[in-house]
Amino acid sequence: MQLDVLSQEETRDNVLETKEDGDEIKIVELKKKGEQLPAIKILVSCHKSEIVVQNDIICPIAVGADNGNKTSFEMRDNDGEDNISHLNARFCELTAQYWAYKNLKSDYYGFFHYRRYMSFRHFDTKCNINVPGIYNNIEQDFGLNESDIRQVLDGVDLLVPVQIPVGSNYNQYKAAHDIKDLEFCLRYISQKYPEYNGAVQRYMKDTNGYFYNVFVATKEIFFEYCNWLFDILMAFDNQKDYSDLDTYSIRTAGFLGERLFGVYVTHLKMTRPKLKIVHAPVVFIKNTHDNTPHVAKTKYKQSIGTSALNCVLPRGSRRREFCKKIYKSVFGKK
């Protein structure tokens, strides 16, 4: 059974849609007669031309547009007067989040990355999922379509990625980056947002972390989060000396944003336990440059080991480079 999907501006009169679940077909009533469908926009940050999932809800956005991003995507992080596109080298995908915060009207705001999507299915999966590329049925397999997205978000306040084991969030950041940067942010929070001190202490000691700067939130939560987040990050950015940093280390604000998101979610859990917060696995796309037949026909596979390795030894981190040197010295392999 195939039904046309109405735009976000239209109402749905007793429309039923089908959702396949194995051999069983479940009929899902999305909205009652006369009710307005909430507007949902999920932005996919792209710093170069890539093959991405896109539809009426999931939209690619060119990030770093002020820095020479020549992609042809209609949405760009320098549209409108209030943007931080010029800070993309330091803020990474957060320039898309800031742009939406200042320029986009919606009821739900979401953020993915051209290689990282959250699945709107497989909620029993407690690890991330690796796929080789964008293939023909990827929207169906991971619920990246309007029907699944609306069904999952109905009544949900915040959709977040599954947490990754890291030892402790404080020590993981210390091993991968300059801990003085995180400590600046934590001091700033203590001084200006003391109501977050409990969440800071709990999350920094937590052995599981939130990563990737991906989530979907209601308008109210999104704006509250952005007011808090960008106040902290701008204070950090204004005092940070970037002159001696390489192209990886300069992405400090983006790295800090991941940790601050975890603090914010922890604060919500502690202070507003009635909020509905749902965890979803992150789908990692390996090849976003082409959709050749062999890629399109390849099914996804779960890879707990790779996801855990990339969290403990993040790509480009000093710890990972140190381990590589040891491996090469012992085995003589590149």
Regions found by a protein language model. Give the residues of each.
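ER/Golgi luminal nucleotide-sugar-dependent glycosyltransferases, focusing on the catalytic module
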Residues: 2-334
